[in-house]
From Swiss-Prot:
Annotated protein name in UniProt: Ciliary microtubule-associated protein 2
Gene giving rise to this polypeptide: Cimap2
InterPro entries: CIMAP2, SHIPPO-rpt
PANTHER family on file: LYMPHOCYTE EXPANSION MOLECULE
Species: Mus musculus (Mouse)
Organism superkingdom: Eukaryota
Amino acid sequence: MRPRTHGAPPRNIMSTIPKWFKGAPFGVQSHRFDVSAVYPNQKKFSTFTEAPYSRHHSVELSHIGPGTYNSKDTCFSKKFLEQKLGSGWSQAHEATRLTQLPHFHYQAIKKEKEQQVHKRGPGSYNIKDFITELQKKPQSKRGLLSSGETRFRGFIGNYYPGPGNYGEKGNPYTQLEEKAWNRSHSDGLMCRVSNKPPLFHQGSGLGPGTYTIKSDLETFVKKSTGNRGPYDIFSGERSSPLPYGHYSVQKMKPKELTDYKSFLDEMNSQHKKKQGVFSKYPRDPKHPTERIFWTTLSQCPKNMDIAGPGSWLPHETEQKHVNRPPFLLASKRCGLKAYQMILGTWNPVGVGRYLNTTLMESIDRRQRYRSLYMSEPKRYLQDLTRDRLMQKRITPITKGKCRPTVDYNSDPTP
């Protein structure tokens, strides 16, 4: 017989463990836990596992079922009551602590409030920036580089087709020739005249003796009139209550059911008319709705119809009519210098040709001293002798003289 190798599972361990029950309580006599779970090759399907080689887990905890409980160790047993009586103060302390605790739904809120009270200072606040706030708002599905536009479109804007691309089969004059030909040959002279309107029907078409004309008297007699007579004040019976006047009796309105609005009337009302209606705005707009996203070219593309670099609109300039000089020279053909050299006269006679054009009335004839024009202005401290002399001229007369002071508040001297 081959000896068993080390680590092989025991083959008769299931038969050696005693049973704690009689019969089959759950319809099966096999054990609830399979010890061979440690060895995958020996594991049975749909069986529970347990900690192997442990009598505490395998016997006391795993074999639980009807008839296996000890009725003596209940909550009313002496052993259980002695344990509870011994720790009465600790239970009272624990109960007091539990009453001070908030409900488990509000524990997170209370903890957050306590942190706000104790943690106050720089760096302890969670202030959200504008980027985080913008991320919470409904935004566009596009990314930073996706414009939502077709990558390759047809030529637009500054594209002009070349020769041979206009008109039918590349000839732009084909349509004009066809119109000229049809206008002069296809329509006749009478075809251009507009249709005349149909004549009106004269008469009703009824023969003599087929209709009757009612007279004015018959029409007046058949006219609907009231049933009251000349002496009838109120219509109806005399015994009925008076509906009008001072002695009238108020009519009671018939009892009617309350007029509730139907579901259709309520949905068509002014406040609920737009509910459930598709919006007219596009889901993916061409330009984003928020101005902060207008900075990037991918989210706010430029209009392709606008002329780009290399194209411009010429400015319309006003053409002014200017009389050009005969030989493109602005100078006079015969100036004053040339006239003096040719004729030899230095004082030509004529209108505007006088050299001395000063008016006699504007000449200043006042006589002045010659020394005024020969003197030069001198600065202060340039000539000390002259400065000392000039200082004496402006010296006041009362310099060095002290006038007697008179006190007008005191009594006059006798």
